[in-house]
Regions:
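N-terminal non-catalytic structural scaffold regions of very large proteins
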Residues: 1-265
Length: 265
């Protein structure tokens, strides 16, 4: 009956994710197959954090927080976190040091915006002004505006902006400027990589294009203050057998509540 006879379900999933990563690292596979496996890993981790991690947190906070393998759920969460950080670090290293250079050698260039020549930079700026800038909205957090809703899985740019206060307010508060957080959600209908005009297969990441033009969205902002972030929300649903007849209603409730699920990553 010893715990050593069992593998913990969530740690087993983490081990499976490692196998997916290893396929992406396998240089004997075709290049696009390797890239696909790296993408599958990201998708698997999203689902894991939306479904499994919220349940682990619930069990960690329950009075009986030891599983049949003899581990506390707090220990499991810590080990999951350690493994996921290791996986994503290795995934990023594989992508940047192997996949992207190999794509470039085959004529598909995912370039850094700073490496473009003047003509290419101008074309990307025009693309921003016509296709990207008009659909972006900067949402500030201040005493009159709560933290904005961040969609599950969306890409966002966050930054702190310093703004001069009116003279009367500055005198009352004893400070000349105020710092506040600004969030910009990148709409999912925009391309993840922006095509460079004049080159058939050259692209730059959309976040680089936005941050290079950040002052056009938030005039007091600086490119160096921008950080890309992404939220993964709790999307798990629990159905008990006795509720099966109310499945449709339960699903409707879950879909409505899911938009505001707790932040898991």
């Amino acid at each position: 009956r010893g715990g050593a006879r069992f593998f913990h379900r969530d740690l087993s999933l983490a081990a499976f994710f490692r196998r997916v990563l290893e396929e992406g690292q396998n240089d004997r596979l075709p290049l696009l197959e390797r890239l696909k496996f790296l993408a599958i890993l990201s998708s698997n981790l999203d689902e894991f954090f939306m479904v499994r991690v919220p349940r682990l947190k619930e069990k960690r906070d329950a009075p009986q927080s030891i599983d049949r393998e003899g581990l506390s759920f707090g220990q499991v969460l810590s080990e999951v976190r350690r493994r996921v950080i290791e996986l994503t670090d290795l995934q990023a290293e594989c992508l940047t040091s192997e996949i992207i250079p190999a794509l470039r050698a085959r004529g598909v260039d995912v370039a850094d915006l700073r490496d473009l020549d003047e003509e290419e930079s101008d074309s990307v700026e025009r693309y921003f002004e016509s296709q990207i800038g008009p659909v972006l909205t900067a949402q500030a957090v201040d005493p009159t505006h709560p933290f904005p809703y961040i969609s599950n899985g969306s890409l966002n740019i966050g930054l702190f902006v310093r703004a001069e206060l009116p003279a009367k307010v500055a005198k009352t508060m004893g400070v000349g400027c105020e710092e506040f957080f600004v969030s910009i959600e990148i709409p999912s209908f925009l391309p993840r990589f922006v095509p460079v005009e004049g080159s058939e297969h050259k692209y730059v990441p959309i976040e680089q294009v936005i941050t290079a033009n950040i002052a056009k969205i938030a005039p007091a902002a600086k490119e160096s203050d921008c950080h890309l972030f992404r939220r993964t929300r709790d999307a798990a649903i629990e159905l008990r057998e006795s509720e099966s007849v109310e499945l449709v209603e339960r699903l409707k409730e879950h879909i409505k509540a899911g938009r505001l699920g707790g932040v898991e990553r």
